[in-house]
């Protein structure tokens, strides 16, 4: 296994780990399925009484890393690579009692008004968990959350205007891409930050 990132804040630490399937002692290489397959897992330690560990438990303190099932062992099919690839974390923002994970999933930003009506842009998934006393998770409620979860899009009024209120959309953020502003090409992306009982989503250059 290889630790690929460490994020810390409040009383918690999160680690992302890549593990490659190898043959165990006594196993024949020819008999091992998925040899060389990489699995990306996310682990957490620290305080969990308000759900910040993200493992579905309300543990007071976790001294050794515990796996976060909702953020581990995820795969998706990549059309370009024509293969299943692991979904890794792009980043984890850690606040005083809550956290948000931006996934490094496949994104698509080429849909336009001239493309078909079924052509849709989609960005990076974001999951939220932990303390929610001040509505910082964006769920519209104040209950703490022990499992990472998706939230609805921020502009629900616009969703209703186009007749989509019955559909289950979720909040995405735009990955880094190039746009033209005032005649100049600028690289922009949306980012998530968690602080002390507050969350911010903003566009950065």
List each language-model region with its residue ranges.
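Periodic beta-strand elements of RCC1/NHL beta-propellers and select beta-solenoids
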Residues: 1-10, 15-77, 84-94, 101-205
